[in-house]
Amino acid sequence: MSEIAPAGQSVMLGGGFYSHNSRPQRAAATAADAHLAAAAAVVPLPDRPTPALVGDFGCAGGANEMAPLAVAVDGLRARDATLPIEVAHTDLPQNDFGPLFALLQGPSSYLTEGVYPYVVGRTLYGPLFPDRRLHLGWSAITLHWLSSMPVTVPNRVYANLVEPGPARDALAGRSAADWRAFLTERARELVDGGELVLTGGASFPDGRSGAEGLFMMIQHVIAEMVDDGELRAGEADRIFYPTWNRTMAEWTGPVEELGFEVLAHELTGTDDAENYGESLARGTFADDYLPFVRAITDRPFFRWLDADRTIDDRAGVTEAFYERLHGRIAADPWAAACHWHVVTLRLRRRPR
């Protein structure tokens, strides 16, 4: 099938909006911090003057990168107090890296003397570093995103709600190809014995990711807007959240074949009803949760509006969607709160 969306389109809202509204992502990735510390304690270190290289794959605005990368830097420095360290934050070229640089100068920064951060504006499903240059890699809640949409899926906005058939097969195929591409490039870039610590959206064997309730609400809102003439049918057909939450079998299946040893693989979860418990208690869940939902859906959804729409028209459609969704979340917050399933992998590059 031909692609309907080119690779390399940023899906996160910039200007710090995503960074300020990504509490669930950090909660989901926290379980991997111990694995990151363990990896930093054992990965091979380079001979001087070559710096150790830590790769951060999918940094977005950087808010959720400071704490885990501090774990990585501290772990490496515990072994060599003056080790020079490069930290490469990677994301799509359209990503807004400005908030990341601001955070690096703030109190939450991992920076210390001899640590050198920089950014790489390229897709993580392609080459990023030279051969055998990377020592430790980290990625949090990124690798379930698809490089592009291989097919339109009318009347559905989320892969876990798509029925078995050609569309679901196309999404699964794109996900599998992306995952293999990521592993192939990292296997090339890592030194022997280098490690990756990765977290991502996952599905249980029964096919559920824990976010179905929210996305069913979204589907209902989109259908209402088409019925009311606020959204065109062709636009609605293209709107989709471009992710595939792999099962554990899908996550681990190609790993050893592509040059890695699996040191740890865990399936955990994070509950947004707990993450936003105070909001539920005081009746403000919709007010507090909607910015998170908007941060992850605004660009993926509304880039598909027809090109003839004016700026004001596009803004009106977008605001109408989130106003309607706010009402649905407020009416049934427990159904909207996601119970995300999360995979954690610790992988070691086998000797060539």
Tell me what each language-model feature is.
Residues 192-312:
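Substrate-binding/catalytic lobe of Class I Rossmann-like enzymes that use SAM or dcSAM, i.e.
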Residues 284-352:
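C-terminal target-recognition/interaction regions appended to catalytic cores
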Residues 141-142:
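Short catalytic micro-motifs in class I SAM-dependent methyltransferases
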Residues 137-138:
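Hydrophobic beta-strand segment of the Class I
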Residues 31, 174-178, 243-247:
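Soluble or luminal CAZymes and related metallo-dependent hydrolases
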